[in-house]
Amino acid sequence: MYKLRKVDKMNRRNFLVGAAGAALSTTMTDRTLGMGIEFHKVGAFELRKYSLKNMAQAEMLHNYLKDAFIPVAKKLGCGPIGVFEQVNHTEIQVVHVLIPHRSVATAFELNQKLSQSKEHLEKGEAFWKATPANAPYDRYESSLMSPFHGMDHLETPDVKSQRIFELRTYESHNDRAGFKKVDMFNIGEIDLFRKAGLNPVFFGQTIIGSHLPNLTYMLTYPDMAAHDAAWKKFIADPEWKKLS
């Protein structure tokens, strides 16, 4: 028996913090936007969600990402890569990895190239030789996204100080409704976000993944007080009320 899902609404919202030393490191910069924000041209985004059972898995996964995956993926043209831990948990249960690609084609090629990289296999040896009883994660999900025309790049904030990242997913009941929501962002909603202090990191329309059709985006703030103030300002904006 299947249960009907309510759609055309914000279905998921997660608050994340950047994992130490790995949150959107700002190499491969194309342009500086000012105020510590950097601009990175992107052809496609991959978003991975690793589910973990314990801190031992978290440590093994982070060591692999830091020592093997991120350095080699950068050499293959990906980046800047972001690693985020979900907050409001006593233990790390979910780790999100954001991987910007030059194109959809390079996204499909990444895993094969990693499997052929001697450096990747050697530096990630403990990860790859882990037994089923000592697996580095339970499972992971992956989605591939196309950047919006209204923001076809990644914006990385200054991550020297701690920040909150908000990952939001909006599901639609059919593709036409999904494209209409993307258009709403492109023609004005992104600009209204910026005006209110909702600082965007990326916007992506999911082309491969679960719960389609959907779009996903990430915002960032110095802290939760700034988050609350920005959303309050956005919701009260007369221009948003006209657009919606």
Model regions: which residues?
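Mature N-terminal segment immediately following signal peptide/propeptide cleavage
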Residues: 42-61, 66-76
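Short, well-ordered beta-strand segments in beta-rich or mixed alpha/beta enzyme
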Residues: 44-52, 83-117, 165-172, 205, ...
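Surface-exposed interaction/gating patches
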Residues: 147-225
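Intrinsically disordered, low-complexity polar regions and short flexible loop motifs
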Residues: 72, 235, 240-242
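N-terminal secretory signal peptides and thylakoid transit peptides that target proteins
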Residues: 2-23
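Glycine-rich beta-strand-turn "strand-cap" elements at beta-sheet edges
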Residues: 16-42, 77-91, 121-162, 197-211, ...
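Extracytoplasmic/secreted proteins, especially bacterial periplasmic and envelope-associated proteins
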Residues: 60, 64, 68, 106-109, ...
